[in-house]
Amino acid sequence: MSVVSSVTVTVPATTANLGPGFDCIGAALTLYNKVKFTRLDAGGLIIHVTGKEAEGVNTDESNLLYQAFVKLYQHIEQIPPSVKIEIDLGVPLARGLGSSATAIVGGLVAANQLAGEPLSQLQVMELAIAMEGHPDNVVPALLGGCRLAATSAEGWEICDVPWDENVVPVVAIPDFELSTQEARRVLPTEFSRADAIFNTAHLGLLLRGLATGKGEWLKTALQDKLHQPYRKALIPGYDAVNQAAVAAGAYGMVISGAGPTLLALADAQNSQAVAAAMQTAWQTVGITADVRSLSLDNQGASSLNEG
């Protein structure tokens, strides 16, 4: 077997929860981080980062991408090689778009390639879930598409969620960060039976709405009572952006992951108008946002090896 000297891995951003699917559903989006790992003969660790938020990325052994790389080698009981890591940041940090998942998946996939692919994709996925602590970002980042994850006696059951091509995700990414830890602190530790039933019903409706593209179902399905009512207070202008998105023709708006990015779903004809309305609404409260009409990424993490 020839030794792989370098590998380039491209990993998509992800949006998790989609309203009622708290901690169990996520989708890959056409926004990417690209990382290149190259073996070093001289030893040591070199990390170079490019991109708008490059200064926010650690360039030592605490780097999450590198930690994931080392984790796989520890799992297969091998010593990780010395590497140079080049990171091209396209996914904003701490915005609710799965930046940590791109690092975990990117590091694991790169390590698996440099090690000669000792692990299956399923095994890589299980390692990624263990590192992240929940499946809703790392699974679609690795596999692509929209994915629903549930625990089973054997581990995880992963289900592909059909997504009608006319349902367009519009993301509004503000110029401020919100940590997942902070967003989780505001959540209650217990929920009422009524709220649990509400979310169960709305998640079922969401799955059918995404599969069929039926707007009336999606307008109802995107509601949630388990996390968004508590988290929206952490996002200035949330109500104004929501009202603007719906007025422009969106089916509804949700918090992407832990936030602060806001995600609207719209049909293809309305997506650009929805994007413009969300951007304007945030501007009225003094917040600059990068608003994009995206698509679902159906490939997930991809790698290119060099001998």
Swiss-Prot record:
In which pathway is this protein known to take part?
A: Amino-acid biosynthesis; L-threonine biosynthesis; L-threonine from L-aspartate: step 4/5
Q: Which UniProt keywords apply?
A: Amino-acid biosynthesis, ATP-binding, Cytoplasm, Kinase, Nucleotide-binding, Threonine biosynthesis, Transferase
Q: Which InterPro entries match?
A: GHMP_kinase_C_dom (IPR013750), GHMP_kinase_C_sf (IPR036554), GHMP_kinase_N_dom (IPR006204), GHMP_knse_ATP-bd_CS (IPR006203), Homoserine_kinase (IPR000870), Ribosomal_Su5_D2-typ_SF (IPR020568), Ribsml_uS5_D2-typ_fold_subgr (IPR014721)
Please give the catalytic activity noted in the UniProt record.
Answer: L-homoserine + ATP = O-phospho-L-homoserine + ADP + H(+)
> Per the UniProt entry, what are the Gene Ontology biological process annotations, in alphabetical order?
threonine biosynthetic process
What is the E.C. number? 2.7.1.39
Q: Where in the cell is it found?
A: Cytoplasm
Q: Which PROSITE patterns match?
A: GHMP_KINASES_ATP (PS00627)
Binding-site residues for ATP, renumbered to this chain: P92, L93, A94, R95, G96, L97, G98, S99, S100, A101, T102
The signal peptide annotation in the UniProt record is none
PANTHER family attached here? HOMOSERINE KINASE, HOMOSERINE/4-DIPHOSPHOCYTIDYL-2-C-METHYL-D-ERYTHRITOL KINASE
- Function summary: Catalyzes the ATP-dependent phosphorylation of L-homoserine to L-homoserine phosphate.
Q: Which family does it belong to?
A: Belongs to the GHMP kinase family. Homoserine kinase subfamily.
Which NCBIfam families does the entry link to? PRK01212.1-4, thrB
Name the UniProt record assigns to this protein: Homoserine kinase
